[in-house]
Amino acid sequence: MPELASRPTRITLVEDDASLLGALTFALEADGYAVAPYAAARPLLENPPESDCLVIDLRLPDMDGLSLINRLRALGPQPPAILITTNPDDRLRRAASAAHVAIVEKPLMGGELRRRIAHAVGKASD
């Protein structure tokens, strides 16, 4: 009997900077992920897709990213989440830690986001 092909890991990506959203979507799809990209929280909350990992910018036009993660998790499954931001302060770090949300700092260089996603979805190559 032939093996069934496994489905790609689904990433929900929310970033209001259009060029960064496009670049991240391209890079993650090139890595084999299925990406659902959004530029704001509201459209995502209206019809959230099934997701294996959330990657969300902190500063969005209609809601902060940590609040969005908490609202999405309250709707059902609680996938791992990664918050992307610039210069997170101690208060944000504590709040993210309490919510079991990883933080990756911008600029997104050196593959840190890719490593965090792979670790979050259990595909780390240690």
Regions found by a protein language model. Give the residues of each.
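Acidic catalytic/metal-coordinating carboxylates
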Residues: 39-40, 64-67
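The feature encodes the CheY-like receiver
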Residues: 61
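Two-component/phosphorelay signaling modules centered on CheY-like receiver
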Residues: 18-36
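Acidic, metal-coordinating helix/loop segments flanking the phosphotransfer/catalytic sites
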Residues: 37-53
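Active-site residues of response regulator receiver
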Residues: 57
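Alpha4 helix (beta4-alpha4-beta5 surface) of REC/receiver domains from two-component response regulators
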Residues: 88-105, 115
